[in-house]
């Protein structure tokens, strides 16, 4: 049986990346909540960055 998680960086960024979050009102709310909480990584696209 094929496993459910078939990783793809492109799909991951398109669905959960920063630009995808900024597109919708709900996504912007997620970002603002994560900023308020003080998250180092706001979205999956931040994982590439050096801190």
UniProtKB/Swiss-Prot annotation:
Lineage of producing organism: Bacteria, Pseudomonadati, Spirochaetota, Spirochaetia, Spirochaetales
A GO CC term attached to the entry: ribonucleoprotein complex
Family matches, as Gene3D superfamilies: 1.10.287.3980
Transmembrane spans: none
GO molecular function: structural constituent of ribosome
Secretion signal span: none
Protein family membership: Belongs to the bacterial ribosomal protein bL34 family.
NCBIfam families: rpmH_bact
GO biological-process terms attached to the record: translation
Keyword Ribosomal protein carried by entry: yes
Organism: Borreliella burgdorferi (strain ATCC 35210 / DSM 4680 / CIP 102532 / B31) (Borrelia burgdorferi)
Name by which UniProt lists this protein: Large ribosomal subunit protein bL34
PANTHER family: LARGE RIBOSOMAL SUBUNIT PROTEIN BL34M (PTHR14503:SF4), MITOCHONDRIAL RIBOSOMAL PROTEIN 34 FAMILY MEMBER (PTHR14503)
Swiss-Prot/TrEMBL keywords: Ribonucleoprotein, Ribosomal protein
InterPro entries according to UniProt: Ribosomal_bL34 (IPR000271), Ribosomal_bL34_CS (IPR020939)
A Pfam family of this chain: Ribosomal_L34
Top-level taxon in the UniProt lineage: Bacteria
